[in-house]
Amino acid sequence: MTITAPAATTAHAAGATTDPMRNHARAAGIFYLLTFVSSIPALILIGPVLHNPDYVTSGGQDTRVLWGCLLDAVNALTAVGSAVALYPVVKRQNRSMALGFVTSRLLEAAVVMIGVVSLLAVVTLRQDFAGSTGGDAASLTVTANALVDLRNWTFLLGPGLMPAFNAILLGTLLYRSRLVPRIIPTVGLIGAPLLLTAMLATFFGAIDQVSSVAGILTLPVAAWEFSVGLWMTFKGFTPSPVLPTIDPADTKAVAHPAV
């Protein structure tokens, strides 16, 4: 003799097992969107320390810069979060490439955090040695500008370089698995070499890092990351052989032995 579970419980169980990867898709998509929400305001907020060579000896806007550094740290964490959320899914397509994607995101986050720490050091110098004059002021300015230069290099080698490798690895995984419409990873795969071109041109001084040419070359990768974030957040994954198969029995009424 069996007792059939209530309909509400059955419906809940069916809904919970219908799409076991939905939470991974939503989490990854939200992390990708948070990258834009955090990185763009961060770049604006840290503007004073980046563009004022005398920031360390002047009345710096420390609170504003600190908020920008905090958002940059959030940006680094979202990179790690997206990789952690996607790995259990994309490893079903190719484990080595999935590990490569996680590694590239971790490296990107680490480089970003180095830049954050360098700007925090500038703020600390300004607060500890405010009002210094003469040789002390000159030394502070040289030190602070060196730290800002360090941050600029991390920006080039982190957000300026690693997204190209991310696009190649994740774009290939998503294209082959068809977890999202193929047009989305195609944009990333096209944009990756363009971003690498922009990075190398900037590295060797052919173009400025903040220029119209650099902006055009980086746009496809930005479009890829934004579109894949939107799709995974609101649509989830497209049915694919790499997704786990749901046993139809899991969606039926739950039977319990009679007492």
Residue ranges of model-derived segments:
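Hydrophobic, aromatic-enriched alpha-helical segments typical of multi-pass transmembrane helices
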Residues: T2-V259
